[in-house]
Amino acid sequence: MRHPLSDAPRGAGVGPAAQGVLVIGVGNAYRRDDAAGLVAARRLCEAARADVLLREASGEGTALMAAWEEAEAVILIDAVRSGAPAGTIYRLDARAEAVPQAWFRYSTHAFSVAEAIALARALNRLPPRLIVFAVEGERFGAGVGLSPGVERAVDELVRRGLQEIDRITRNSR
């Protein structure tokens, strides 16, 4: 059995991520809503018809940069805390706009998702396409299971993620 925080790849697809879409689920399965990125990414990859590769990450910035290094298209999903109502979903094109660092102020890592994206941008190491989906969490304390609002949002994240994969694969043909 794989540890849920593993940074090792899990694949629904075949071959390197450069041939399909890399979906990175970020989170901690043992901190309630922090698991939303992991749960959404798993469900998205199970539902996807296209060639996708799932990678689960704890959110440590350098590991994220290494994960997307060879990828042409990346969808990254994580839980955030911005003060919006639980279950609020954000979509950002990380090549075109900055990811708010304040979303990750409660991260247990010194080098967050937002900082990894900012550094990769400065080093010209962003993948050609990097879409960030973030869901507003409610409970980040120890425990398992998502709060009801976040659980509902995961279903919507999967729907939006499937649309994103369709757009990416349609444009790469």
What name fits each language-model region?
Residues 2-137, 144-156, 160-172:
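N-terminal catalytic or cofactor-binding beta/alpha core of small enzyme domains
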